[in-house]
Amino acid sequence: MQRYAVGIEFSGIQYRGWQTQQPGVASVQETIERVLSKIADEPITLHGAGRTDAGVHATNMVAHFDTTAIRPERGWIMGANSQLPKDISIQWIKQMDEEFHARFKATARRYRYVVYNAPHRPALLHKQVTHIYQKLDVQKMIKAASKFEGTHNFETFRAAACQSNQPVRHVKHCRLFQHGRYLVLDIQADGFLHHMVRNIMGCLLEIGQGMYEIDHIDTMFAAEDRKAAGITAPPDGLYFIQCYYPEQFDLPQPPLGPHWLNLPE
């Protein structure tokens, strides 16, 4: 039995998220498993580094699978990409020791959330960004983003249906920057709760619209109640961009996305 790690890029528009759903419901995981199973001529199960909601995208989702099939790495990539739908692409594959696990060996994960802030919605970026037409106080949002850095109880900023046993997470960085008409939230943490990034982005958007002051974030944290925070931002602008592992695994490090924005690393 051989273990492979894979890096996957996908648009989440047509899928009900990463994780396999009930029969007849399209998911990214199930779509890739079906193709890899054909190539391997045996059932393949993918184990992803994380889960994404319906409509959320990824530029480097890491996963792994085990197989008895012997193929060169290039053969796996070319074979899979020739059969996968155009909105899913295998970017790299690497043979690994069985010690590697895409989820349990990950030390951190990183997301970017992209807002297009302009009077009119962008037709060519439909469901690839979140459009906000209201004028935003960007400098205020930038200052507010740093409030989420460090170790906190994120009970207020997770979905009511979140199944995680405990809500404490360490956020290494939470930075918001402006790139022309785009606002980009870049956040890295040891782990994320269900809807955590989208709820943080929703909070920042409300601050940018003047609905409350930056210090109100402290009140939200203290409440430890989802009802104390504001909106959940749409999934459209959210991208899973990187997963980090110990150096011993030496996984490929592709450029951070989304690539069409040509953002700084």
Curated annotation (Swiss-Prot):
Catalytic activity of the protein: uridine(38/39/40) in tRNA = pseudouridine(38/39/40) in tRNA
Keyword Disulfide bond carried by entry: no
Active site: 53 (nucleophile)
Highest taxon of the lineage: Bacteria
GO molecular function terms attached to this record: RNA binding; tRNA pseudouridine(38-40) synthase activity
E.C. code: 5.4.99.12
Binding site for substrate: 111
Sorted UniProt keywords: Isomerase, tRNA processing
One annotated GO biological process: tRNA pseudouridine synthesis
Record-linked InterPro entries: PsdUridine_synth_cat_dom_sf, PsdUridine_synth_TruA, PsdUridine_synth_TruA_a/b_dom, PsdUridine_synth_TruA_C, TruA/RsuA/RluB/E/F_N
Presence of the UniProt keyword Isomerase in the record: yes
Chain's role: Formation of pseudouridine at positions 38, 39 and 40 in the anticodon stem and loop of transfer RNAs.
Subunit structure: Homodimer.
Similarity annotation: Belongs to the tRNA pseudouridine synthase TruA family.
Name listed for the protein in its UniProt record: tRNA pseudouridine synthase A
Organism of this sequence: Acinetobacter baumannii (strain AYE)
Gene: truA
